[in-house]
């Protein structure tokens, strides 16, 4: 599978650096069944990461050090991801039968016609997808390119915590990997469905439509759980930390549900509906089989039910760990609550088994 940097390693920590937290996941596999060995989530300082870009390297490095302690893991090799919006991908046809080295050399010659940056500033990777449908003597090759600074800043943040980035992946591919674990939730093989995965983070909502297990459409929108946190702060005079805790643990005044939470849920429904309309307008589909909610905001009580009721499409909250065993040190309740926010970390941790 595609990764902008690959170095051979055994078990790898999946580390997702989002705008508000770092999430760590360690998986093992025995007899075809996965097991969660360790996981932890650690908040980031405000504005340490802005719109998927690491701004405060030191702050992110310190959060990574804390998340390692919290997870009680001894592993030092990790997989991180760059955002899909930072990556240029292009499927190109190439001669069949070339070795990996020959493909790589050929791509270096041809890459500048596909990439709008000087090649010395770019990390490039590729994956052979299979024989071309148009010409059986050629193969389809997926080319991925990303500015080196996006890769290097993630490597540097990990290094501050004593970690080595063995693979730098792409968030969209990590999502595809963890999505494949949702078959039992969806009641069907994920390869047979068209599913809208809506990842509602703190500041960004990403719609990824997967058809037969592959991402066919992505759209990012500036909208997320931070809007709810800010409204709690404003209305009840709380700090960011207090508002974030109250949002998760409750204890807010009686009017919270009707005056704050319900309008926010309605706004989420509107965002999901609008994103789907953009997807349908783009062409070949006018329906999806399921809506799957991911990200920290997905676990708001009954949000899935409200979306299903308003949009009319079966909706569920992602839990990639539903069929996994758990190490005794892993808190099952906390993991279930955090599961929808761990889709990318899970997809990254699965790189251990490539």
UniProtKB/Swiss-Prot annotation:
Gene3D superfamilies, A to Z: 3.30.1490.300, 3.30.420.40
Binding residues for Mg(2+): 112, 115
Sequence positions that bind ATP: 18-23, 202-203, 247, 296
UniProt entry keywords in alphabetical sequence: ATP-binding, Cytoplasm, Magnesium, Metal-binding, Nucleotide-binding
Subcellular location: Cytoplasm
Keyword Ribonucleoprotein recorded: no
Xref: SUPFAM superfamilies: Actin-like ATPase domain
Major place of residence: cytoplasm
GO molecular function annotation: ATP binding; metal ion binding
Record-linked Pfam families: PilM_2
Mutant phenotype after disruption: Deletion mutants lack surface pili.
Domain of life of the native organism: Bacteria
One cellular component (GO) term of this entry: type IV pilus
Its biological purpose: Inner membrane component of the type IV (T4S) secretion system that plays a role in surface and host cell adhesion, colonization, biofilm maturation, virulence, and twitching, a form of surface-associated motility. PilN/PilO heterodimers form the foundation of the inner-membrane PilM/PilN/PilO/PilP complex which plays an essential role in the assembly of a functional T4 pilus. In turn, associates with PilN and facilitates PilM functionally relevant structural changes that differentially impacts PilM binding to PilB, PilT, and PilC.
Assembly, per entry: Interacts with PilN; this interaction modulates PilM ATP binding site. Interacts with PilP. Interacts with PilO. Interacts with PilB, PilC and PilT.
Name under which the protein is recorded: Type IV pilus inner membrane component PilM
Organism (species): Pseudomonas aeruginosa (strain ATCC 15692 / DSM 22644 / CIP 104116 / JCM 14847 / LMG 12228 / 1C / PRS 101 / PAO1)
Gene: pilM
């Amino acid at each position: 599978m595609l990764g902008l940097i690959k170095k051979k390693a055994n078990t790898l920590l999946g580390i997702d650096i989002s705008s508000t937290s770092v999430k760590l996941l360690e998986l093992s596999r025995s007899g075809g069944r996965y097991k969660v060995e360790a996981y932890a989530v650690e908040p980031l300082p405000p504005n340490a990461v802005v719109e998927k870009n690491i701004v405060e390297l030191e702050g992110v490095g310190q959060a990574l050090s804390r998340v390692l302690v919290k997870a009680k893991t001894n592993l030092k090799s990790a997989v991180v991801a760059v955002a899909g919006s930072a990556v240029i991908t292009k499927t190109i046809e190439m001669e069949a039968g070339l070795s990996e080295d020959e493909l790589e050399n050929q791509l270096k010659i041809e890459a500048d016609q596909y990439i709008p940056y000087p090649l010395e500033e770019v990390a490039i990777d590729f994956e052979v997808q299979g024989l071309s449908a148009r010409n059986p003597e050629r193969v389809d090759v997926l080319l991925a390119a990303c500015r080196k600074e996006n890769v290097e800043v993630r490597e540097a943040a990990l290094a501050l915590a004593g970690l080595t980035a063995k693979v730098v992946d792409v968030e969209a591919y990590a999502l595809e990997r963890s999505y494949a674990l949702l078959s039992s939730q969806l009641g069907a093989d994920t390869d047979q469905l068209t599913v809208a995965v809506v990842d509602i983070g703190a500041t960004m909502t990403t719609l990824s439509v997967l058809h037969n297990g592959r991402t066919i459409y992505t759209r990012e929108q500036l909208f997320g759980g931070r809007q709810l946190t800010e409204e709690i702060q404003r209305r009840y005079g709380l700090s960011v930390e207090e508002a974030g805790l109250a949002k998760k643990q409750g204890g807010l005044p009686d009017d919270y549900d009707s005056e704050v939470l319900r309008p926010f849920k309605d706004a989420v429904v509107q965002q999901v509906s609008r994103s789907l309309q953009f997807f349908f307008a783009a062409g070949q589909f006018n329906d999806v089989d399921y809506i799957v909610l991911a990200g920290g905001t997905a676990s708001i009580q009954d949000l899935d039910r409200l979306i299903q009721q308003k949009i009319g499409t079966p909706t569920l909250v992602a839990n990639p760990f539903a069929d996994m065993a758990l190490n005794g040190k892993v808190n099952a309740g906390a993991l279930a609550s955090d599961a929808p926010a761990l889709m990318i970390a899970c997809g990254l941790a699965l790189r251990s088994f490539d």
